[in-house]
Design a protein with these regions (language model features):
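Glycine/serine-rich anion-binding loops at beta->alpha junctions
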Residues: 53-91
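A short, aromatic/hydrophobic, helix- or strand-capping loop or linear motif
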Residues: 48-52
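Extended polybasic, low-complexity segments that bind anionic RNA or targeting/receptor surfaces
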Residues: 1-47, 92-224
């Protein structure tokens, strides 16, 4: 895998390069781990407010609708039974919390695994900027993205203070935009290409490099 990545200038061409740290962009892509983390993330997004009434909760009389024998019909004990129209639901749904506990190291490993896969597949890109002045321009953003990534689903990663670029790409149908500190395994894995601005890339690498070095130091101290 290449250890550097060309930085694309707003007007096209190369504007230098950036290093791809092996600790971030050359990690094992553990598919079962990524699946587990993505499933947990989607489960946590569920509201879990579903509720249906059981036979003990629906309105209706508790008396026997007709006598036990002599009518020719099947015996019934209540109009609130599930087989009746307006009766309660069998195994009624109750509000519940779908969130799963996922260790932080697993979440981090899943994200690095996806980013490493995109880097190995040459689907990770860095642009110097979107070449915008003080005013947003979706047209300019589209031209740059079309030159960098031609896939149907593109993830754009920006810095939080880059409001002009954010406003320029947020309404594009095939583009999903995140800030560097929001990057996660799900949004990365459902995107065909990932496009960083150089400022966002530097911020992301700096944050992850600090986390990786801290984790390595902790494990070394634990071993001693």
């Amino acid at each position: 895998m290449a250890t550097t990545l060309n930085v694309v200038a707003p007007k096209g061409g190369s504007k230098g390069s950036v290093e791809l740290p092996a600790a971030i962009f050359d990690q094992q892509t553990n598919v079962p781990l990524i699946h587990q983390v993505v499933t947990a993330q989607l489960a946590a997004a569920r509201q879990g407010t579903h509720k249906t009434k059981g036979r003990g909760e629906v309105s209706g009389s508790g008396r026997k609708p007709f006598k036990q024998k002599g009518t020719g019909r099947s015996r019934q004990g209540s109009v609130r039974a599930p087989e009746h129209r307006g009766g309660g639901m069998v195994h009624s749904l109750e509000p519940r919390d779908y969130s799963q506990r996922t260790p932080k190291k697993m979440i981090a490993a899943a994200l690095l695994g996806v980013l490493s896969d995109r880097a190995r597949g040459e689907r990770l890109h860095v642009v110097e900027s979107f070449g915008l002045d003080d005013a947003p321009s979706t047209k300019t953003a589209i031209e740059l993205l079309d030159a960098v990534a031609t896939s149907k689903n593109v993830l754009v990663v920006l810095e939080r203070n880059d409001e002009v670029s954010f406003k320029s790409v947020r309404n594009l149908k095939h583009v999903h935009v995140l800030f560097a500190d929001q990057l996660n395994a799900y949004d990365a894995v459902v995107s065909d290409d990932i496009v960083f601005t150089k400022a966002a890339f530097d911020a992301f690498v700096a944050a992850k490099s600090g986390a990786v070095s801290t984790g390595s130091t902790t494990e070394k101290e634990a071993g001693e």
